[in-house]
């Protein structure tokens, strides 16, 4: 669910996922069920079972249903801008977002299969101290307050999202995020990269 420039290769991969969705055979065992079939189109970018293997694409495996559904609604409605994600969010909403959200929430989350800069992660741990007030010491977030987990997401994805928040290009004008964006404006690009490395390292 990344707001970034799309490429022809990624569109082809996503199109392949749509073809799988249409032509998917019956699957027995733990993959059986409506959520699995409906989520096939997502796997082209987000990986098998939602375990992303790329820097800029988030992990969906183990994602709480409330946050997955919020993200889909935000993309589909245009509140979260992404020409790449908007049509897929609308498709997921039409197919049945509850089934897809439940499928990804039930998937085991694998250790992040990406290299993490240890020195950057160490610096990021220090920089993340003010973030812990909302996201928790270990980055798990707080569902009761609508605060998502940050831990174990790819560093490239986290960095991109932090840059978007800092520039007020994600959730623009949302009152609950005013203080967050003000804090991020005090961080330079290198510090945001360190923060991303730290939270990504929690998934190793």
Task: Please provide the spans of the model-predicted regions.
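Bacterial N-terminal signal peptides that target proteins for export
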Residues: 2-15
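Bacterial N-terminal signal peptides
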Residues: 13-23
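Sequence/structural segment immediately N-terminal to covalent heme-attachment motifs in c-type
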Residues: 28-49, 112, 116-140, 153-154
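The feature marks the first
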Residues: 32, 37-77
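Disulfide-stabilized extracellular ectodomain repeats and their linkers
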Residues: 39-42, 57, 65, 82, ...
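Axial heme c-ligation environment in periplasmic c-type cytochrome domains
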Residues: 53-59, 75-108, 112-117, 144-149, ...
């Amino acid at each position: 669910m990344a707001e970034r420039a799309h490429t022809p290769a990624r569109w082809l991969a996503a199109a392949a996922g749509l073809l799988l969705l249409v032509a998917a055979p019956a699957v027995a065992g733990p993959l059986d069920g409506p959520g699995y079939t409906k989520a096939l189109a997502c796997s082209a970018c987000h990986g098998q079972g939602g375990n992303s293997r790329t820097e800029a694409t988030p992990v969906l495996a183990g994602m709480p249903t409330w946050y997955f559904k919020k993200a889909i609604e935000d993309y589909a409605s245009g509140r979260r801008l992404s020409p790449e994600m908007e049509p897929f969010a609308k498709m997921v909403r039409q197919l049945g977002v509850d089934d897809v959200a439940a499928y990804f929430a039930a998937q085991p989350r694998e250790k992040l299969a990406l290299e993490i800069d240890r020195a950057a992660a160490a610096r990021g741990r220090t920089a993340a101290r003010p973030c812990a007030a909302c996201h928790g010491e270990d980055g798990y977030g707080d569902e009761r307050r609508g605060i998502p987990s940050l831990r174990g997401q790819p560093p490239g994805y986290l960095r991109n999202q932090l840059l978007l928040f800092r520039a007020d290009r994600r959730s623009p004008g949302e009152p609950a995020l005013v203080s967050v964006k003000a804090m991020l404006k005090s961080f330079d690009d290198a510090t945001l990269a360190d923060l991303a490395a730290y939270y990504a390292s929690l998934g190793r």
